[in-house]
From Swiss-Prot:
Binds 1 [4Fe-4S] cluster. Its EC number is 7.1.1.-. Keywords: 4Fe-4S, Cell inner membrane, Cell membrane, Iron, Iron-sulfur, Membrane, Metal-binding, NAD, NADP, Plastoquinone, Quinone, Translocase, Transport. It is a peripheral membrane protein. GO terms for biological process: aerobic respiration; electron transport coupled proton transport; photosynthesis, light reaction. NDH-1 can be composed of about 15 different subunits; different subcomplexes with different compositions have been identified which probably have different functions. This is NAD(P)H-quinone oxidoreductase subunit K 2. Its cofactor is [4Fe-4S] cluster.
């Protein structure tokens, strides 16, 4: 048998450092594991097909040939277990909040969230008197990029995707799990909603501020303006007394 031990030793333990030729230096890229990992994810962001209101119509417009979001490597997925991006397009209600948190928890790491539209970010036009709207999706799940608007244009979604890719390019995959932990969130899938009294009642008509005009207006017209739209028992009695006096006269 041939003795290949000397040749094997020279292969594994060369006497001198091999030189890198010019042809090899032009075809080899030196990088780090982080950069390689992030580079592979930049062009393979898979969003979850998720929408609750009118903002999703703008997101659905990206699928057409006019915008063609496939050139960004976006592949819409119907299952959260195959997606790494969720775009919350639309209003989030208290009843749907547990489902959203469950979808987020089912997505594999690393995962990202884009809050799209005013209703998702602050509650939008439902933020003042709606007892069922969540005032900001970031109270439920961590958000990476916000897209203001009502609704935002498809170009704004592309801008958010570009900003998200820039954020992904500078991440260290060993640190992300610690920075976005759910420890600072007060909501979980097992959270019990606290019942809130209905603010839409007729009692506001009887408030003191609704019974008379503002002082500045009353002083300007030199009279009080009752704003009560319902007749009180005292007013009904005064009206009846006046009708009796008119009948006697």
């Amino acid at each position: 048998m041939f003795n290949d031990r000397p040749q094997t030793d020279r292969m594994f333990f060369p006497p001198e450092r091999p030189e890198v030729t010019s042809e090899l230096s032009n075809n080899v890229v030196l990088t780090t594991l982080n950069d390689l990992y992030n580079w592979a994810r930049l062009s393979s962001v898979w969003p979850l097909m998720y929408g609750t209101a009118c903002c999703f119509i703008e997101f659905a417009g990206l699928i057409g040939s006019r915008f063609d979001f496939d050139r960004f490597g976006l592949v819409p997925r119907a299952s959260p277990r195959q997606a790494d991006l969720i775009i919350t397009a639309g209003t989030i209600t208290m009843k749907f909040a547990p489902a959203l948190v469950t979808l987020y928890q089912q997505m594999p790491e690393p995962k990202y969230v884009i809050a799209m539209g005013a209703c998702t970010i602050t509650g939008g036009m439902f933020s003042t008197d709606s007892p069922t709207t969540v005032r900001g999706v970031d109270k439920l799940i961590p958000v990476d990029v916000y897209i203001p608007g009502c609704p935002p244009r498809p170009e704004a979604i592309f801008d958010a995707i570009i900003k998200l890719r820039k954020k992904m390019a500078t991440e260290d995959f060993r640190e992300r799990y610690d920075t976005i932990a759910q420890t600072h969130r007060y909501y979980t899938a097992a959270h019990r909603m606290k019942a809130v009294a209905d603010p839409l009642t007729s009692e506001y008509i009887r408030l003191e501020s609704r019974q008379a005009a503002p002082p500045a207006l009353a002083a300007a017209i030199e009279m009080g303006i009752p704003l009560d739209l319902q007749r009180t028992p005292q007013l009904e009695e005064q009206i009846r007394d006046g009708e009796h006096r008119d009948a006697r006269a």
